[in-house]
């Protein structure tokens, strides 16, 4: 794999709450120069990013970020608005507390609601795996697949329990493999 191939696998991300318009414009310029797959910005910056990306760079955003503690309808509305403003991808955060409680029907319903709201866009679902047991990770992956997610992701990078680790990635791969 060469540098350009690797760059095409990267979402150049800016999700810090203090980000400004000029930060987003600079992010878009960097992404074009580096040849990344996308820029990932907060929903309030989707229109600005869409107007400033070039060189085939896509726009990604988040919903329910970073806590996942938004009602499914709010997540779906946020995602739908972002897609209408130019987002090609949406990274949604599950309500990890519901996963910990084993409320799998709720989890599947919230992912399904966002999936329906993002027709034509990629839907990536963030699980916060550091807060989950192995069994919960596997079950969450299965329910995300059933709900129509395109990808599952380990972590937001903002959760106090931590981020991605080999254990979680292995479980995710064993559960959904190359399907998600």
Where are these regions (language model features)?
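Short, hydrophobic beta-strand segments that form beta-sheet elements in well-ordered domains
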Residues: 38-41
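Alpha/beta enzyme core
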Residues: 1-34, 44-180
